[in-house]
Swiss-Prot record:
Pfam families: DUF2498
TM regions (residue ranges): none
Gene3D superfamilies named in the record: Protein of unknown function (DUF2498)
Source species taxonomy: Bacteria, Pseudomonadati, Pseudomonadota, Gammaproteobacteria, Enterobacterales
Protein name: Protein YciN
Length: 83
């Protein structure tokens, strides 16, 4: 990261992430970030990946992955986690 980032707590970050999800034009119903960690300056979001009964990805899994990737890109440039 080249830019200075702002500190943010986990709960506030998840609220902002879920607001972005709800307002995103490509979102699907039910996508929600329920957890976040930070690895090497990158925020990693987690939640339900909508796997099938065998634990395999579904069409919705790809949408979730792409949304969490979008959140990581957008929010890692702005924030770093503080607990």
């Amino acid at each position: 990261m080249n830019k200075e980032t702002q500190p943010i707590d986990r709960e506030t970050l998840l609220k902002e992430a879920n607001k972005i999800i709800r307002e995103h034009e490509d979102t699907l119903a039910g996508i929600e970030a329920t957890g976040v960690t930070q690895r090497n300056g990158v925020l990693v979001f987690t939640g339900d990946y909508f796997l099938d009964e065998q634990g395999l990805p579904t069409a919705k899994s790809t949408a979730v992955f792409n949304m969490f990737k979008h959140l990581a890109h957008v929010l890692s440039e702005k924030y770093h986690l503080v607990d």
